[in-house]
Amino acid sequence: MQKKFTFELAGRTITVETGKYAEQAGGAILISCGYTALLVCATVAKQAREGADFLPLSCDYEEKMYAAGKIPGGFIKREGRPSEKAILTSRLIDRPIRPLFPKGFYNDVQVVATAMSVERDVTPDVLAMNGASIALSISEAPFAGPIGAVSVGYVDGQYVINPDFEQRSRSRLHLTVAGTADAVMMVEAGANEISEQEMLDAILFGHEYIKQIVEWIKTIQAEVGKEKIVPVIHTPDEELKAKVVEFARAKVEWQLDTFDRKEREVRTEQVKAETIAHFAEEYPDGAADIDAVLYNLMKEILRDKIINKGIRPDGRTHTQIRPIWSEVGILPRTHGSAVFTRGQTQVMTIATLGTLGDGQTIDGIGEEEFKRYIHHYNMPPYSTGEVKSLGSPGRREIGHGALAERALLPVIPDENEFPYAIRLVSEVVSSNGSTSQASICGSTLALMDAGVPIKAPVAGCAMGLIKDDSTGNIAILTDIQGLEDFMGDMDFKVAGTQSGITAIQMDIKIKGIDKQILTRALEQARQGRLFILDRMMETIHTPRPELSPFAPRILQFSINPDKIREVIGSGGKTINGIIAETGVKIDIEDDGRVFIASTDAAAAEKAKNIIDNIVRDIQVGDVILGKVVNILPIGAQVELKPGKKGLVHISKLSNKRVERVEDVVSIGDEILVRVIEIKPDGKIDLTRKGLIPEEGRR
């Protein structure tokens, strides 16, 4: 049965159509707002995936170029691999819904959101998140939602829900928040150094609107929702569980009774092997269940030690940060480099400077975007002591790179101040938690080593949460390591300067967190960030005054935009000739700004002089060194600048009478000439008289 539902949110109408499209999907809707529309479908497999010990949930956001009235470029004319924006949107959909499936539910669940029509004032990402929540809610999937999602801007001191294009361009905050009616589930934000209180208020402001969205989705579910399947939850046999816990509790406590990670890993494998061997005869096929029981037992003991005894796996207090050391200038041939180490997490970041032409133009279904600052994050398998095949970056690497890029963006100098494209690459060479935040710290150091005049240094710190649902006790942990992230309930990354927050990313494994936890976590993160910044400044406290000798020097000046065509020349002939002659790289913007890049200052200056001569208006009386390009019976044609020629009449070639032009000049000669007349049709008359001494026949 076809149904249409509408909802007013912040002055816009959201429309959902059900029962009309994709009827074989578990739950399918067309959700639209303004001219933006997405088809969102959710489907759940009937059986659990064999051998799975995790929720096999996949969320895919697809951009179709027809949504913006475009035809894909290239020979194939078909959409290719997902764009970075599409991958980040897929992650946004996944993160708030994943914790709301039952533990032990191993059926495949797939959510596909396809952007079918877009306008610039309504971004499809938040609409896709709400669409996924609705599709899952009306499907048979055992989804403990719904959730709602909004974006929040901060424009002229006011919070704005789902800001339009113009508001986004002026906003100090770009926040996406998702949650249930009771709690916040996910936060993703980039900001221009806003305070912790401003960020908290923005999150809570957004949550008030989320509550309205959730109530609306519940009415849709009540009217058209399918009956939920009874999930088959795989749990180990209770008798086996009791026996393993009794046998292994003391062993697991011993396993965790060391602050050394490597020793703990050795003990973990030893306890696992001993326990499986002990029950091998009684439970010959029970290895997987025994492993699961041991994992849960370790998690229980570890969380109890942290919450009730204040002991973390490596012996730190709840607010203590791991030992930090850093260096800069570690790679001599690069433009800037740094290594940042925090505990067993180590990241090398390399900065490369280029011309604006080296920036990235992104032409997707939204507005065409140009990026002159790019950050890439790589995490090879050796960083965790594993052996795996190398491949293209995965969703996690792309997400971490985008987070670090967002964290540094507010402090990158304006292109008028620093006319360079900047690429940062963070190589994780050792990983034990918080690698994305270490890449932010390493990026700050590498930028300063490269001589980039950043507005302020940026550091990042990852916060964790352990919550005991039975008692309500919580522990908020500063600078979490891998085990605490794996066993904990929250991964809350906060990056910023001394003045404020520049980026946030929060993922929750439980059913949301409240205002009290958010407030404490933000303040604890601020204190941790300031401590880390102090340590970083001991390595390098200001950007280097000079660029690397291997970095290009960029000469910037402006010309009349009407003269750009003259500089470029027919088919690029003029500008390519300048590049070939001087060896420089030239970029010209539509507004007339010219950027000349070269490691040779003299070559850059020569190219500038050539361009100055090209764009300079020729006037009567000018004396110019020109090149003879053609010999005519009546005189010589002289190129005064690319694309501009004049004629020296035979009677004006010399201070005395000339019988033949060839007697005085030849093609290719460079001669001084004076402009004596510029005719209405643009033709230029020249003379050599008065510029040369008496000449004889050649």
Feature names for model-found ranges:
Residues 1-30, 34-45, 229-367, 552-566, ...:
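Extended amphipathic alpha-helical scaffolds
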Residues 27-29, 122-140, 328-351, 432-452, ...:
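Conserved phosphate/anionic-ligand binding catalytic regions in large, soluble enzymes, centered on
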Residues 550-554, 561-698:
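Single-stranded RNA-binding regions, centering on S1/OB-family and related RNA-binding modules
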Residues 103-109, 144-146, 213-231, 262-263, ...:
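Flexible, glycine/charged-enriched surface loops at secondary-structure junctions
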Residues 140-256, 447-545:
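Mobile "lid/hinge" segments at catalytic clefts and subdomain interfaces of large enzymes
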Residues 13, 25-110, 115-122, 181, ...:
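Glycine-rich, flexible beta-strand/loop modules in the N-terminal catalytic cores of phosphate-handling
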Residues 2-5, 9-12, 26, 37, ...:
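Alpha/propeptide regions of enzymes that mature by internal proteolysis
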Residues 227-238, 531-557, 605-625:
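Long, charged amphipathic helices and adjacent flexible linkers at domain junctions
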